[in-house]
C-alpha cells in the first residue's frame, strides 16, 4: 500500500508542463525531477545524487546527445538510465529508446514518467528493462543502433565480456558511447580510488573487438568520452 502511495505521489510531483502529442515533436528535454526521485546506490555502496549538482550544466547533455549522431529512425539503448536524465533528451530525436537499469525503483520511476509524457499510442517508443547483476545488458542480437553508457562503466563486472555482448547486440555500423568521471579531483562524482583512467577503458574496448575507438577528455569538465563503432561488415 505504501509503495503504491509513494508512486502516486511521485507521479503527481513530476507532472510535466509539456503536452502529449502523437508525433515525435514536443518539449521532452525539461522533465522536472524532484526530491521524490529515487537515489542510486551503486555496487560499492555509494549513493549518487547527481540531480542536485547542476548536472544540466556540467554534464552538457546537448553536447552528449549530439555525439550520438543522427538518431532518426534509430533505436538507442540507455544503460544505467537512472531517472531518465538522458532517456528523455534522446527520445525526441530517436525512433525508440530502451532504458536499462539494475534498480527496479528507477524502472518504476521511468514507467510512471512514460505514462505522463507519452500518449498511449506512443508507449512503444520508450521501453524499460531491468538488468541483472553480473549479467550482460538485456539487449537482443543486433537490436540497437546506438548504446549510451553514462556514469556506469566503472561498476560493471567482467567488463570485457560485457563489452563483447554490447558489440554483438549493436547493428553493423552501430555506435557505443561511454562517459565516466576523470581520474582526478572533481566537485562531483565517485571517489578517485574507484575511478578508471581513460586509457584503460580505451584498451578494453579494443580487446572486446570494437573498431574506430575515439577518445575525448576536453568536451566535458569532469568526465571523459569514448566513442567506439562496430564495423559495417563482420566476417
Give residue ranges: language-model regions.
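Class I SAM-dependent methyltransferase SAM/SAH-binding core
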Residues: 77, 81-136
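A short acidic, Gly/Pro-enriched loop at the edge of an enzyme's catalytic core
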Residues: 137-147
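Conserved alpha-helix/loop element of class I SAM-dependent methyltransferases that forms part
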Residues: 55-74
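Conserved class I S-adenosyl-L-methionine
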Residues: 177-202
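A short glycine-rich, Lys/Arg-flanked "PGG" loop and its adjoining helix->strand segment in the class I
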Residues: 160-175
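Class I SAM-dependent methyltransferase Rossmann-like catalytic core
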Residues: 42-58
Amino acid at each position: 500500500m505504501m509503495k503504491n502511495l509513494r508512486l502516486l505521489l511521485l507521479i503527481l510531483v513530476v507532472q510535466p508542463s509539456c503536452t502529449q502529442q502523437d508525433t515525435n515533436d514536443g518539449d521532452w528535454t525539461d522533465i522536472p525531477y524532484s526530491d521524490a526521485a529515487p537515489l542510486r546506490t551503486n555496487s560499492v555502496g555509494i549513493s549518487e545524487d547527481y540531480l542536485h549538482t547542476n548536472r544540466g550544466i556540467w554534464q552538457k547533455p546537448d553536447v552528449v546527445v549530439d555525439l550520438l549522431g543522427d538518431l532518426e529512425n534509430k533505436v538507442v539503448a540507455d544503460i544505467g538510465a537512472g531517472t531518465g536524465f538522458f532517456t528523455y533528451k534522446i527520445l525526441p530525436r530517436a525512433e525508440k529508446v530502451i532504458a536499462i537499469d539494475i534498480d527496479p525503483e528507477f524502472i518504476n520511476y521511468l514507467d510512471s514518467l512514460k505514462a505522463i509524457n507519452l500518449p498511449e499510442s506512443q508507449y512503444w517508443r520508450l521501453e524499460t528493462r531491468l538488468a541483472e547483476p553480473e549479467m550482460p545488458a538485456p539487449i537482443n542480437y543486433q537490436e540497437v543502433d546506438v548504446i549510451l553508457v553514462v556514469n556506469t562503466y566503472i561498476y560493471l563486472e567482467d567488463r570485457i565480456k560485457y563489452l563483447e555482448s554490447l558489440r554483438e547486440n549493436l547493428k553493423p555500423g552501430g555506435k557505443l558511447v561511454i562517459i565516466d568521471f576523470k581520474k582526478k579531483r572533481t566537485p562531483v562524482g565517485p571517489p578517485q580510488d574507484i575511478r578508471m583512467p581513460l586509457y584503460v577503458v580505451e584498451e578494453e574496448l579494443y580487446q572486446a573487438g570494437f573498431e574506430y575507438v575515439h577518445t575525448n577528455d576536453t568536451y566535458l569538465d569532469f568526465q571523459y568520452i569514448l566513442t567506439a563503432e562496430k564495423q559495417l561488415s563482420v566476417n
